[in-house]
Regions:
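Conserved alpha/beta core of the MobA/IspD/sugar-nucleotide pyrophosphorylase nucleotidyltransferase superfamily
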Residues: 67-141
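General alpha-helical segment detector with a strong preference for membrane-spanning helices
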Residues: 18-20, 132
Length: 141
């Protein structure tokens, strides 16, 4: 079975995230959302919002929310996202797109995505093998 059929009422976590705060994963979510940290400036992926609704994203920005790699999708939005992923994949150049671009760029007007506030203490992003070894000594061989 293809993962795009499993997005309804589901969390999606990027593979390089180590979750420190288990309360980020909650039994009930009532709106699709991205976990984000309010920052004055970032060179990382970030979200822009208006009145609690995500209105855009970019690599780098000011007065934005830095994306932390954890999202939640409602039943309705998960179904739409699954369908739209297939459509974007079939577009010219679609195979080179990130899955996030589907809801945040190509079909942003079809989603009502909120930002869930979190902090840098809630996660660790592991970008290098050395960072992984610092966290898990079993890799230090």
């Amino acid at each position: 079975m293809c993962v795009r059929y499993l997005l309804s009422n589901s969390y999606v976590l990027e593979g390089d995230i180590l979750l420190h705060n288990p309360k980020i994963i909650q039994k009930y979510q009532y709106q699709s959302n991205y976990c984000g940290i309010k920052v004055d400036r970032t060179d990382d992926w970030c979200l822009f919002e208006n009145k609690g609704r995500v209105t855009g994203y970019a690599v780098g920005g000011e007065n934005c929310h830095q994306i932390m790699g954890i999202t939640y999708w409602t039943e309705e939005d998960g179904k739409k996202l699954g369908e739209y992923i297939k459509k974007v994949y079939e577009m010219p150049g679609g195979k080179e797109r990130y899955w996030d671009q589907v809801a945040l760029q190509y079909y942003i007007d079809d989603f009502d995505i909120a930002i869930r506030e979190c902090s840098f203490d809630d996660f660790i992003e592991i970008d290098t093998f050395n960072e992984l070894k610092a966290i898990d000594k079993s890799y230090d061989v």
